[in-house]
């Protein structure tokens, strides 16, 4: 009887320990990554962050006796090219996908130094309404999209000077340090550090199970609003475009998913063919 009691206690202790680790480990790891990669993060903030953009959708819908305008929470993108006053940026295709049950969609871009509506109000800006506020920002032109890679190339006009980033020459490898710069969960210009967690590319099916993406995993913390953002290596070159993330049972971030730079390069090659 005593032996059975000891075994039960041991099992309970093991399960409790596992539960504690499951709860706290996902919270500790990002903090460790941020602390150990402070210099890398500061380099991104100083020399690359102005290439980060926020993409906001305004959707218009008209009913029998009413009309409405909805403003999205926003997503991310990264500037990769400039021609005159026109900037070209990469993002995820699902970020700019247009809803079918609306009458009109307008997609605008905020540069890294442009304020969100709530931040503008907090700094004493005039309350002209959220839709009117975002309408003053440049509207995007969709240059090229691909369902098979969930990538999109967009462009917008601006007189401001923003950083233009390049694609990395080498494919990211398991254990490589990377940094994400994005606009997660209502925040702006957040840089997080992590590592590539894939030893090889793996296939991911979209929710419709119609499209498979060959992606890489990474541990840089992201959230809603990070879709379309850039993953950078220590040379501040783009090694991937972030698509989404995975959570555990406690809704804590576990890992991110990104399209690697070789597929991004192939995507841009397809675009070049369409304009040549």
Predicted regions, residues:
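Serine endopeptidase catalytic core focused on the charge-relay Asp
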Residues: 129-201, 233-234, 243, 255
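Catalytic-histidine neighborhood of serine endopeptidases
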Residues: 82-146, 244
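C-terminal cap/linker of serine protease catalytic domains
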Residues: 32-33, 40-43, 104-128, 238-276
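Soluble periplasmic/extracytoplasmic beta-strand elements of cell-envelope proteins
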Residues: 52-56, 76-80, 88-92, 108, ...
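A conserved glycine-rich beta-strand in the N-terminal activation segment of trypsin-fold
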Residues: 39-41, 62-92, 191-193, 228, ...
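A glycine-centered beta-loop-beta connector
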Residues: 82-87, 175, 231-237
């Amino acid at each position: 009887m005593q032996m059975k009691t000891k075994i039960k206690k041991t099992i309970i202790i093991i399960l409790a320990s596992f539960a504690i680790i499951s709860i706290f480990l996902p919270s500790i790891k990002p903090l460790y990554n941020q602390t150990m990669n402070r210099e890398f993060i500061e380099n991104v903030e100083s020399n690359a962050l102005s290439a980060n953009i926020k993409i906001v959708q305004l959707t218009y819908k008209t009913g029998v006796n009413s009309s409405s305008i909805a403003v999205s929470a926003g997503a991310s993108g990264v500037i990769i090219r400039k021609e005159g006053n026109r900037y070209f940026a990469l993002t995820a295709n699902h970020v700019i996908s247009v809803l079918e049950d609306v009458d009109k969609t307008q997609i605008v871009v905020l540069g890294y130094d442009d304020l969100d509506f709530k931040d503008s109000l907090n700094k004493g800006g005039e309350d002209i309404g959220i839709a009117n506020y975002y309408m003053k920002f440049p509207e995007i032109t969709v240059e090229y999209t691909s369902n098979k890679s969930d990538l999109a190339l967009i462009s917008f006009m601006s007189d401001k000077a923003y950083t233009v980033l390049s694609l990395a020459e080498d494919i990211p490898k398991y254990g490589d340090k990377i940094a994400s710069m994005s606009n997660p969960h209502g925040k702006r210009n957040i840089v997080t550090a992590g590592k590539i967690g894939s030893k090889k590319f793996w296939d991911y099916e979209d929710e419709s199970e119609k499209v498979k993406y060959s992606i890489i995993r990474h541990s840089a913390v992201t959230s809603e609003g990070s879709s379309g953002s850039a993953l950078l290596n220590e040379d501040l070159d783009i090694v991937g475009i972030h698509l989404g993330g995975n959570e555990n049972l406690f809704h804590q971030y576990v890992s991110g998913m990104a399209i690697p730079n070789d597929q991004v390069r192939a995507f841009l090659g397809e675009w070049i063919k369409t304009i040549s």
